[in-house]
Amino acid sequence: MENLIVAISNFPAVLPIGLSFLKRDFITFGTITFVSIASFISHLIENHKHGMPGIGFSQQTSYIWNRFDVLGCILSVARFSYLYYNRHGLTVVPIVNNKWLFAMTIPVFILLRVSEYDKYNPNLKTRYIITHCMWHAGIFGLMYYFLKNIVY
């Protein structure tokens, strides 16, 4: 059940996925779809860290799917960087002037760091579940906001 909770917390990905689809930006659509599916599967079978039980796959399989999740994150950063550069060049003014985006990015990434702190200590599993679910909601919300207000 714990794995399912963290896996389902990827649901907010439908916002940036839907927006990129409506804007006919199929590369971004594919990138966000990839990371959200990889994250969903990774968290569903996760049993190699955080004391999560998984759903019966080996720890090696859990680790490999976690690497797919990380790959999706890297691809997403690359894609969003490309979109930003194409629209704004090297200036950071649109980000710095957008106080909401600037202010929300910091706590969202703090949630990620807190959720991944001491990932091999099963006593921190509850903290991991809560903060990682909040990370998913936050990062996909930021993706949507960034696409809608900075890129498109």
Swiss-Prot record:
Keywords: Membrane, Transmembrane, Transmembrane helix. It is found in: Membrane. It is a multi-pass membrane protein. One of its GO terms (cellular component) is membrane. It comes from the Viruses. The chain crosses the membrane at residues 2-22, 26-46, 92-112, 128-148. Coiled coil: none annotated. This is Uncharacterized protein L282. It comes from Acanthamoeba polyphaga mimivirus (APMV).
